[in-house]
Structure formats: structure tokens, C-alpha cells
Amino acid sequence: MSKFNRIHLVVLDSVGIGAAPDADKFFNAGVADTDSDTLGHISETAGLSVPNMVKIGLGNISRPIPLKTVPTEDNPTGYVTKLEEVSLGKDTMTGHWEIMGLNITEPFDTFWNGFPEEILTKIEEFSGRKIIREANKPYSGTAVIDDFGPRQMETGELIVYTSADPVLQIAAHEDIIPVEELYKICEYARSITLERPALLGRIIARPYVGEPGNFTRTANRHDYAVSPFQDTVLNKLADAGVPTYAVGKINDIFNGSGITNDMGHNKSNSHGIDTLIKTLQLPEFTKGFSFTNLVDFDANFGHRRDSEGYRDCLHEFDNRLPEIIANMKEDDLLLITADHGNDPTYAGTDHTREYIPLLAYSASFTGNGLIPQGHFADISATVAENFGVDTAMIGESFLGHLK
């Protein structure tokens, strides 16, 4: 019998809590990640007021220097700790795959200086369209169409760009390059990026519409991912008949592997929280696992190095946390964590190699305190033990510490 009938895992994308022990091996604009501290630096530079996460125990997580504006709680309502990554990467897919039990020993490839000519030329030859070389670099998805959309409308060239994650994205105006044509080009791009030196996690079709100065991306986005190289705990759950619900980009991150119910993409964090709440309210969801990613922290504020915007985004989540809890049942377990860091005060624009926080809450708890410090995969091991399935490659369950 399961200790918790339902477990809900919410990933606050990029909300790290201090440099990891191996941060000296990871860099931003030539600067090692050793001084990165997403939550710490936001609390120092912008101020941070997250009373609902404080109640669970966020301020009690062990740190060399306490969070400046996040107090400790004498009698928290939950259990907390911080977790270390063992995989060789600090991207979204690596973090999520490890959280679900895998050890990624060969990281995906990222292209901070844009994609090599060999790849661009192959895409041009296949598509019969030229590629705008000036867009070939890490770029905001909205900024890239603002900057190059007018040119694409005139010439029909492709907008190919990347990000901090191991992705190749192709933006195309639907009136200039039909969606089905864009999909075929992306399928080809997927076929040539499945091994080194260009092993990419995802190819993303990014259709948009509108006129110069007023472009908007459409719902016709399509992701061409790769499946995890081995079964994750999601697969173990699905194979055992335990329903799994994906909210936000979780389904894309795992290429649908082990997901029995995809609840769709999020338009924003607020929309994602709405979708999570609707998922919690589903009458058929009496037992199982929900997995939510809220990406605005990372996409809108971490990469853009916007501390105040990041702070406000954390405030927004914290303000809505009581709504999530109000829609949980007494025998539900809520786990709040992250997948990597993205310190908005740091050099460069890339993710930062950090510990991630873990907050655990259930109305059924009679105790509280600290969970032993562990690793990302401890989350999946805990989920696995609760539902009576095998773990994946790595992870130690902390289920016994939750009382």
C-alpha cells in the first residue's frame, strides 16, 4: 500500500540554491560557476519575500550563508534539503532525466557560438532555403523573430537559432513557410543531430504570425526530442499501471516516454499552475504521479539576467502555492524542486551549476525537519518506493524520513 496515493513534483526551472561542489568545472563567459547562487543572490540584490515556502522550511536548508531575506522557521510544516547533481551537464534535459533516475555521463552538445557551417549547409540543401547567418547564435525566441522576421518575410530565408540548452530551433512565419514544410525541415534537422559532435536534445519548430513589430508565436510549435537512453521511473510507473501526468514541457523533455497523460504546454507559469490545479481536480486522478515544469524563471529572467523579474516570478509562485495545497488531498505529497541554477547576477547568460532545493509537504505530516542531503535522483527513488516500483539507475529514497 502506498504511503501517499498521489505525489506531485513541481520543478521551478533554474531555481538553484548555491554553487555545487564541482561548479569549478562549469563556466559562464569564461567565469567558473563557483560563486553562483541563484536564490542567494536574488535575496541579496532584489529582496525576496516567499512566506509560503518559508512555512514549509525553505530558509532552513543548510547553506554557508543564510538566505538574506528568507528567514528560518522554528516549526516548519514540511521537510527540506538540497540535492547535488552527478550528471555531466547543467541543461534542462540532463537535470530532469537525473531527477527521474538516470546518470548522464555524456552531456548533450550546446552551441554557444552558433551551429557549424556543415549543419547549416545540410539544412539549406535539404530545404532549398537559405539560412540567416546573423541569427545563428543563442537568442531569445521572441527577440529573434522581432529582429529577423521582417527579413524572412521578404526573402523566405530560415531563422535558425539556439539557446543555453542543447536545442536547434527554426522559426518560420506561417504565411511564408507553411507549417507542414517547417515540420519536414525540422524532421530532417533531427535526423542529422543524433550523434556527436552535434548530439542535440531537441529540435523545435517555432511558427509565428503577424506583421513586423507585432509578431506572435502560434500554438503550432512542435518538438522533436530524443527519448531517454534507459527507462526512467516514469516508465516504471506507467508499466505498473500507475498514471503519470505531465504539465508544461515535461512531455517534451522525456519525448513522451513514460507519460500516460500529457496536460499540454504552459503559456506562462500562472497558466501552468492553473493546469496543475485542474489536474489535481480530475475525478479519475485518485492515485498516481504528476510532474510539472514552470519555466518562466529560467526563460524570462535567468538567461536575461533580470534579478528583479526573477524575484517577482518567485513571489508569483509563492502567492499561488496555497491554491495548489488547497487542491491536494490529505494523503498527497507535494515536492518542490529545480533542475539546475541560472543566477541572474552572474557572468554570461548560461545556466549555473548549483545545488537544487527540495521542499516536501503533506497535510498528513506529523513531523518536520531536514532530509539528509543527497542527489537529484533521490526524488525518483522516493517516488518509486512509494508506488512499489523499481528505481532506475541511481537514487536513494528519503520516503522513510517523511513522517
UniProtKB/Swiss-Prot annotation:
Check the UniProt entry and state the signal peptide residues, or none. none
Cofactor comment text: Binds 2 manganese ions.
* Positions annotated to bind Mn(2+) 2: 298, 303, 351
EC code? 5.4.2.7
Care to name a GO molecular-function term for this sequence?
magnesium ion binding
> Per the record, a Pfam family?
Metalloenzyme
Q: Which cofactor does it need?
A: Mn(2+)
Q: Where in the cell is it found?
A: Cytoplasm
Taken from the UniProt entry, a GO cellular component term is: cytosol
Job description of the protein: Isomerase that catalyzes the conversion of deoxy-ribose 1-phosphate (dRib-1-P) and ribose 1-phosphate (Rib-1-P) to deoxy-ribose 5-phosphate (dRib-5-P) and ribose 5-phosphate (Rib-5-P), respectively.
Sequence similarity? Belongs to the phosphopentomutase family.
Q: Name it.
A: Phosphopentomutase
Read off the lineage from the record: Bacteria, Bacillati, Bacillota, Bacilli, Lactobacillales
| The encoding gene | deoB
